[in-house]
């Protein structure tokens, strides 16, 4: 093989994209991964890291440009780690995400008879995030900075705008930055593990415009608290809720367990089509409301509900998908391991007058067996696990339960593919639909239909 060493300057043609959106150049079948390079581009690059099985390169020049290359509209794109694909046209982003799913399910796992649909995209793939988590820090000049992290680091890029956040969020961010400076609020310094203000979190109701502002602090004592609230209300009189979240752990976890309401309500309200949801500062709620409706509508289509089915909603969170399905089902049973989420789900069921729902706290594999012993037999099981996918014991429980259909929503198609191989013992994977929940990033969500063989 041709010698490859750090700092070498080389040229080559990009032959593929990784799941992280990096261009792939090969030298005698040895891959070099180059951020922001696109397929079919002829490029000049510098080797910056060499490993046993791959190398990392830095793009220097593009000699032949891809027809899918576009100018990134964000002035922070080259430095910020929030987006990875702004240099790729949106149509090509959707195709890339479909290719990721095809590669996982058909090329690697050999689900050759399973249909992979086109990625469901957005008409306007910007300003879609209804929740922003913004780190607060200080620069070398000891000035307050707020923004997002540089890729693969905890270096904060000081920003005034973000094109994938709700526009209200950047207004709040810039106002809060000014308030923190004016009132000389102590700023948390991660390396020293000292200081007070750690993060600003903003949540908005996509359909209601209700807004919650959360200050995450390293400890409860906050001398300027009342003055900050007063200035926030002067700037944003329509704010629904202002909260302080206490996080005195020295970890990467953004929020702590204790929250104090400083102004207004404990929760905000949002809607997904005809369903209404109370959202707390800690609630899991899909980030992209517009795409969530498309995702859930596809899930209902896959569930094939006629009004006579019993639905089991596992990993149910605050009950969003279960309550979305309840009007179309005979009864929905939801199970979730987080107690506060089940409390929210029960309240949301009351708000939506869903009398055909039951929400229980516990491990899904254990609660399912309890329901089975009570004679409860689901026709459809909804699965929407975290990124790590389903526990194998849960999969084995599903296989003994034998529902007619399993509808599996995933934020990590790689673990969904792993679980699909286990389900294949008794289930046929009919089709998978990618949904673009996070445009301009490499993340892809999928919803899959499994039918009992």
UniProtKB/Swiss-Prot annotation:
GO MF terms held by the record: 4 iron, 4 sulfur cluster binding; metal ion binding; rRNA (uridine-C5-)-methyltransferase activity
InterPro entries cross-referenced by the UniProt entry: MeTrfase_TrmA_AS, MeTrfase_TrmA_CS, NA-bd_OB-fold, SAM-dependent_MTases_sf, U5_MeTrfase_fam
Alphabetically ordered keywords of this record: 4Fe-4S, Iron, Iron-sulfur, Metal-binding, Methyltransferase, S-adenosyl-L-methionine, Transferase
Listed EC numbers: 2.1.1.-
Enzyme class: transferase
Any one biological process term the GO annotation gives: rRNA base methylation
PROSITE patterns assigned: SAM_MT_RNA_M5U (PS51687), TRMA_1 (PS01230), TRMA_2 (PS01231)
SUPFAM superfamilies: Nucleic acid-binding proteins, S-adenosyl-L-methionine-dependent methyltransferases
Family matches, as Gene3D superfamilies: 2.40.50.1070, Nucleic acid-binding proteins, Vaccinia Virus protein VP39
Keyword Hydrolase: no
NCBIfam families (UniProt xref): rumA
PANTHER family found in the cross-reference section: RNA M5U METHYLTRANSFERASE, TRNA (URACIL(54)-C(5))-METHYLTRANSFERASE
Name of the molecule in the record: Uncharacterized RNA methyltransferase SAS1819
Organism name: Staphylococcus aureus (strain MSSA476)
């Amino acid at each position: 093989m041709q010698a490859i060493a750090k700092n070498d300057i080389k040229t080559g043609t990009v032959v593929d994209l990784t799941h992280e959106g990096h261009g792939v150049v090969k030298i005698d079948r040895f891959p070099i991964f180059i951020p922001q390079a696109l397929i079919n581009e002829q490029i000049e690059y510098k080797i910056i890291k060499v490993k046993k099985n791959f190398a990392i390169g830095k793009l220097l020049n593009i000699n032949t440009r891809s027809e899918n290359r576009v100018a990134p509209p964000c002035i922070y794109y080259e430095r910020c780690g929030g987006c990875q694909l702004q240099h790729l046209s949106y149509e090509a982003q959707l195709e890339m995400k479909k290719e990721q799913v095809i590669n996982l399910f058909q090329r690697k796992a050999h689900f050759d008879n399973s249909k992979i649909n086109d990625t469901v995209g957005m008409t306007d793939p910007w300003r879609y995030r209804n929740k922003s988590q913004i780190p607060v820090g200080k620069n070398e000049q000891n000035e307050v900075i707020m923004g997002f992290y540089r890729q693969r680091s905890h270096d904060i890029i000081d920003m005034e705008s973000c094109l994938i956040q709700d526009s209200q969020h950047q207004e709040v961010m810039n106002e809060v930055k000014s308030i923190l400076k004016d009132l000389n609020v102590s700023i948390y310094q991660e390396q020293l593990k000292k200081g007070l203000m750690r993060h600003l979190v903003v949540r908005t109701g996509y359909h209601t415009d209700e807004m919650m502002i959360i200050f995450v602090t390293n400890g409860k004592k906050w001398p300027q608290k009342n003055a900050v609230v007063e200035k926030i209300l002067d700037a944003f009189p329509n704010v629904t809720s202002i909260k302080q979240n206490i996080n005195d752990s020295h970890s990467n976890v953004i929020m702590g367990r204790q929250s104090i309401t400083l102004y207004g309500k404990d929760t905000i309200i949002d809607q997904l089509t005809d369903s209404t949801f109370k959202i707390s500062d800690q609630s899991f709620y899909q980030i992209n409301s517009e795409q969530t409706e498309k995702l859930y509508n596809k899930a209902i289509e896959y569930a094939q509900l006629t009004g006579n089915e019993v639905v089991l909603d596992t990993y149910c969170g605050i009950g969003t998908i279960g309550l979305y399905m309840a009007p179309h089902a005979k009864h929905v049973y939801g199970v979730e391991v987080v107690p506060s989420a089940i409390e929210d789900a029960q309240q949301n069921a009351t708000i939506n007058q869903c009398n055909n729902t039951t929400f229980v706290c516990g491990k899904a594999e254990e609660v399912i067996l309890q329901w089975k012993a009570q004679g409860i037999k689901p026709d459809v099981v909804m699965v929407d696990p975290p990124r790590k996918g389903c526990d194998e014991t849960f999969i084995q429980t599903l296989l003994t339960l034998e529902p007619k259909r399993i509808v599996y929503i995933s934020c990590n198609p790689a673990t969904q593919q792993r679980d699909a191989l286990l389900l294949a013992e008794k289930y046929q994977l009919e089709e998978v639909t990618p949904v673009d929940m996070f445009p301009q990033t490499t993340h892809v969500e999928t919803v899959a239909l499994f039918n009992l063989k």
